[in-house]
């Protein structure tokens, strides 16, 4: 069957490891998709949102370098272009083709603020946790 769960590319490695009977490596940020594949109930529930980062990946570098992040829920998608302080906000239920950018809409200001907070949280939790840092022991 088909699932409409929100998933990320980082979920693939933990899924393959679980299928091979191996534990995820320390610091892996993905979540195994195995429950979705087994259809353990919540077939359409995996994540509340998905996160994406874009760092100047065009075939021709731009100035200033392009740096954008995105958070998407089932209902909304918010893209923040950090290099220009511009953004995009779409209501995916009302506008699945993403044609009407609501970034500047006063009627969507509360949704925008909530998604910006959600984006900031995802950015904070997505920082590379490795290598594990040790506190040096001081002799004294």
How should these model regions be labeled?
Residues 1, 97-101:
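Short small-residue beta-strand/loop micro-motif enriched in glycine and branched aliphatics
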Residues 1-9:
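A short, structured beta-strand-centered segment in the mid-to-C-terminal lobe
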Residues 4, 103-107:
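Short alpha-helix boundary/capping segments
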Residues 10-13, 18-88, 92, 97, ...:
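C-terminal cap/loop subdomain of S1 sulfatases and analogous C-terminal strand-loop tails that border
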């Amino acid at each position: 069957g088909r699932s409409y769960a929100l998933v990320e590319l980082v979920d693939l490695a933990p899924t393959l490891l679980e299928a091979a009977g191996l534990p995820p490596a320390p610091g892996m940020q993905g979540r195994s998709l195995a429950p979705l594949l087994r259809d353990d109930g919540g077939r359409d529930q995996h994540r509340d949102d998905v996160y994406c980062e874009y760092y100047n990946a065009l075939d021709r570098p731009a100035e200033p370098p392009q740096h954008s992040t995105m958070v998407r829920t089932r209902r909304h998608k918010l893209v923040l272009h950090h290099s220009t302080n511009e953004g995009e906000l779409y209501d995916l239920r009302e506008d699945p083709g993403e044609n009407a950018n609501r970034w500047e809409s006063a009627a969507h200001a509360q949704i925008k603020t909530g998604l910006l907070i959600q984006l900031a949280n995802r950015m904070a939790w997505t920082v590379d946790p490795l290598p594990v840092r040790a506190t040096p022991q001081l002799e004294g």
